[in-house]
Design a protein with these regions (language model features):
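Conserved nucleotide-binding/hydrolysis micro-motifs of P-loop NTPases
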Residues: 155-158, 177, 186, 318
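Conserved beta-strand -> loop -> alpha-helix junction used to position metal-binding or nucleic-acid-contacting
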Residues: 167-184, 191, 198
């Protein structure tokens, strides 16, 4: 037997201070661990209720699908009268250069919205409004109310709309960028994630209506009745997110200034670059490359002179030998394996 300094009694499970544990998990935002470690005692439930993921909220939606010019006129009137509206596009591709517009969704009030199908194509598909009809009514209304427009990732929607005759050269807000400004360290700012995080709402997923992997179909092939609920929800949730995020930004003037003066103007710049590319002066680029090469060569010569010998600057092993063994520089930090870092 080997004495390892541990006895059997010390390995017994002790009582957990669930309230302290829940408090710690809440502070550190360890939601999965909170669920795994919770004993679900009444006290534990109360202490960690903010960490428990509730059943997703279901809205009493009032969505409509527009097939008539009268419907377009009614919604054009709504855009004129509202303070802010959400807009979203549905396409048959994620490539803004080649994607075709399949439909437009709008929302002027929470728990309501409309979908305007334009490019659905499947057997038995009902007659849709033409692009020209939509532009004549809704397109013009969108343009004259553009400064009320809110979207989620408008860098995608703006070029899609532009290629189909609707110019959105100004807008009110982008919820994806609002989320980024509020929480720049978050890894995801997509609508589905934001809806769950800020609204506790589980959205309809694209895979739910169009399939996944090899069985996935184009949005243009999705039946309009099914597509409409998905698309209108996108606009509705975007409007809800805007209202929530706008409230969170009310006491953050610096972030709002950054949004309006940098992030929002940059949307148009990046959109144009993606559509048109960027011009590069080949001669200037070669000249700059030559300057950098000369500078690198000069710095390399200096490094050899200081070390007293030539070595491979790209080799971490040789760098360690030169810096810490030959030049005796102090080791300020080490790697987990004990090597100078």
């Amino acid at each position: 037997d080997v004495d390892i300094g541990v006895n059997f009694e010390s390995l017994l499970e002790l009582n957990t201070n669930q309230e302290k544990l829940d408090e710690l998990f809440s502070e550190l935002e360890f939601k999965p661990m909170a669920k795994n470690f919770s004993k679900q005692s009444p006290a534990a439930k109360e202490a960690s209720k903010d960490l428990q993921e509730k059943s997703p909220v279901k809205s009493n939606n009032n969505y409509e699908t527009l097939f008539t010019k009268k419907g377009l006129k009614d919604w054009a009137n709504k855009l004129d009268k509202c303070k802010v509206f959400a807009i979203d596009t549905e396409t048959d591709s994620l490539d803004t250069v080649t994607a075709n517009l399949v439909g437009i969704s709008l929302s002027v009030k929470e728990d309501s919205g409309c979908y305007i199908p334009i490019g659905h194509n499947y057997e038995g598909c009902p007659k849709q409004l033409t692009l020209e009809e939509v532009i004549h009514e809704i397109g013009i209304a969108i343009e004259r109310n553009k400064e009320k427009a809110v979207g989620q990732n408008l860098k995608f929607d703006i070029p899609i709309l532009a290629r189909h005759g609707i110019i959105l050269d100004k807008f009110h807000a982008d919820t994806m960028l609002m989320s980024y400004i509020l929480n720049s360290t978050a890894t995801r700012h997509g609508m589905d994630k934001l809806a769950m995080y800020y609204l506790n709402y589980e959205t309809i997923k694209y895979g739910d209506i169009a399939g996944t992997a090899s069985k996935q179909i184009s949005f243009s092939e999705v039946e309009i009745d099914i597509a409409s609920n998905y698309a209108a929800e996108d606009a509705d949730i975007t409007l809800k997110l805007f209202n929530k995020l706008d409230e969170l930004l009310t006491d953050k003037p610096n972030q709002v200034k950054l949004l309006k003066e940098l992030e929002y103007p940059l949307v148009h710049v990046l959109s144009r670059v993606e559509q048109n590319g960027a011009k590069i002066d080949k001669d200037k680029l070669k000249e700059h490359s030559k300057e950098l090469s000369e500078k690198i060569a000069d710095l390399t010569t200096q490094a050899y002179k200081i070390s007293g010998a030539e070595f491979n600057l790209d080799s971490p092993k040789q760098l360690l030998e030169v810096l810490y063994e030959k030049l005796k520089l102090p080791v300020l930090k080490k790697t987990p394996k004990g090597q100078p870092s």
